[in-house]
């Protein structure tokens, strides 16, 4: 019965091509072994092109830019400024907001900006919902209160980066240091340095914690290079920093300082 089943399977679509493939292989081997090597090389190139076409088409379908951050980081106002250019009073939300954003480049591309809730009980839940469509992540930081919130910021950033490392599309990643119009705001360089220190501490703490994984579970991803002080450059995805201000330097009616953010969005679109 096994041989009969095998014959029936071979007589299908695959079996129809088998005699042709066998004769082609024999002919190539008889004529010149080098010819067979060339044929294999050409086939490898074709398979590589098909693979990259698949990756590119998948990347093209991912048009979402996720705005994440702690509550009161100013990400919702940043979201509104990019879309309308206007100031608007905002409040903490328990759901997401999304809109099409026309990027400022010669290609006329568009992105879908998605503002995710910053509340601690909701932010990871919404990140899970939208991460598969993410072309980019904008992690918004309140530069004015960063010094006292650095541990909370680093904790959330750690969770996002660990999750992003598991994503196959490795989204573009930006830390937007917002509220630069406030006198006590920390610079993007200082924020980067302090976050690297905090993330290094978190990494050591997490790795030293007792594991609760059973034999069927997957070990958590390692953030950065083992045995070295953590730096963002060690990650498989590129993390960039820039300074911005959603409110603007002249009060509510003032124009926002979001030009660098607009340029970054145009670059990754």
Curated annotation (Swiss-Prot):
It is a single-pass membrane protein. The keyword Transmembrane helix applies. The modification Phosphoserine is found at residue 110. Gene3D superfamilies: P-loop containing nucleotide triphosphate hydrolases (3.40.50.300). The gene is Srprb. This is Signal recognition particle receptor subunit beta. It comes from Rattus norvegicus (Rat). GO terms for molecular function: GTP binding; ubiquitin protein ligase binding. GO terms for cellular component: cytoplasm; cytoplasmic microtubule; membrane; signal recognition particle receptor complex.
